[in-house]
Amino acid sequence: MISSNDFRTGVSIELDGSVWRVVEFLHVKPGKGSAFVRTKLKNVQSGSVVERTFRAGETVPQANLEKRVMQHTYKDGDQFVFMDMESYEEASLSQEQIGTRVKYLKEGMEVNVIQWGEQVLEVELPTSVVLEVTQTDPGVKGDTATGGSKPAIVETGAQVMVPLFISEGERIKVDTRNDSYLGRE
């Protein structure tokens, strides 16, 4: 159980038989009446977002989530299959469940898989990945590191803005949180 006073962004709770993650919270103490906590909750299974108010000190069950390191082994239709490297158990997630993170997911990559009981909820990618540039405009002699940027397509199909001196075939490091170029690899 967790008190509404302990809500923070990212805390997972159980409500109405499903797992919800706190996206935003605000502790409110009006001049008249009792304090309360206004929250914005995201359903981890469906992705829906709701606003809900809790009384200060109200307790709700905290979701018991398990984080396991798994390797992305292959794609079967719109299902992405992951395997636990210790127990060799397989778990699959649909492209909808993975969402926009799919653009950085490649076979053989190790990721954190979040489970609630036996149900797989979501995938956490590493904060940065190394990918090969498959398509970009050619660099021209005289392009410098401070001269600007151009779009590049990487091996997974994602588009990343890169410096002008980057050319096709180079391996670059990309931040998966904000799609930014971090450097050459």
Curated annotation (Swiss-Prot):
This protein's record includes keyword Cytoplasm: yes
UniProt xrefs under SMART domains: EFP, Elong-fact-P_C
Compartments reported by the entry: Cytoplasm
Keyword DNA repair (UniProt): no
Pathway(s) the chain acts in: Protein biosynthesis; polypeptide chain elongation
A Pfam family it matches: Elong-fact-P_C
Taxonomic superkingdom: Bacteria
Main location: cytoplasm
Entry's Gene Ontology cellular component terms: cytoplasm
GO annotation (BP), single: peptide biosynthetic process
GO MF annotations, alphabetized: translation elongation factor activity
Family: Belongs to the elongation factor P family.
Biological role: Involved in peptide bond synthesis. Stimulates efficient translation and peptide-bond synthesis on native or reconstituted 70S ribosomes in vitro. Probably functions indirectly by altering the affinity of the ribosome for aminoacyl-tRNA, thus increasing their reactivity as acceptors for peptidyl transferase.
Name this polypeptide is given: Elongation factor P
